[in-house]
Amino acid sequence: MQAKAVARTVRIAPRKARLVIDLIRGKEVGEAFAILRHTPKAASPIIEKVLKSAVANAEHNYDMDVNNLVITQAYVDEGPTLKRFRPRAMGRASAINKRTSHITIVVSEKKEG
């Protein structure tokens, strides 16, 4: 059985969030929390919140053992881009793309043996 949590339209660039997601993919939940707490990236607290939600979903919805959970899937997709303009010299303007992410974490119980 799998439990899933998704954070949609999070205001962090997918490229930056993927750096942190790659650190925890395939790890046990306790180990993943430790990694996230000691990773000095802006995406760490956001991903920790999504992981906490996935663990809570596993415990509440599927009666899984929290101490026996492993992250089976973790990925970041691109969300909608907010387009802004920055005024430049001589009346020009340049585009600023504020990128957003959809962060998905799937946890399941560890296989016995």
UniProtKB/Swiss-Prot annotation:
Q: Which GO terms describe its molecular function?
A: rRNA binding; structural constituent of ribosome
Q: Which domain of life is it from?
A: Bacteria
Q: Name one GO cellular component term.
A: cytosolic large ribosomal subunit
Its Gene Ontology biological processes? translation
Q: Which InterPro entries does the record associate with it?
A: Ribosomal_uL22, Ribosomal_uL22_bac/chlpt-type, Ribosomal_uL22_bac/org-type, Ribosomal_uL22_CS, Ribosomal_uL22_sf
The yes or no answer to whether the keyword Ribonucleoprotein is present is yes
Q: Which Pfam families match?
A: Ribosomal_L22
* Residue ranges crossing the lipid bilayer per the database entry: none
* Keywords noted in UniProt: Ribonucleoprotein, Ribosomal protein, RNA-binding, rRNA-binding
Subunit note = Part of the 50S ribosomal subunit.
For this chain, the family text in UniProt reads: Belongs to the universal ribosomal protein uL22 family.
* Function according to Swiss-Prot or TrEMBL: This protein binds specifically to 23S rRNA; its binding is stimulated by other ribosomal proteins, e.g. L4, L17, and L20. It is important during the early stages of 50S assembly. It makes multiple contacts with different domains of the 23S rRNA in the assembled 50S subunit and ribosome. The globular domain of the protein is located near the polypeptide exit tunnel on the outside of the subunit, while an extended beta-hairpin is found that lines the wall of the exit tunnel in the center of the 70S ribosome.
Q: Which PANTHER family match?
A: CHLOROPLAST 50S RIBOSOMAL PROTEIN L22-RELATED, LARGE RIBOSOMAL SUBUNIT PROTEIN UL22M
Q: Which NCBIfam families match?
A: rplV_bact (TIGR01044)
The protein, known as: Large ribosomal subunit protein uL22
- Identify the species of origin: Geobacillus kaustophilus (strain HTA426)
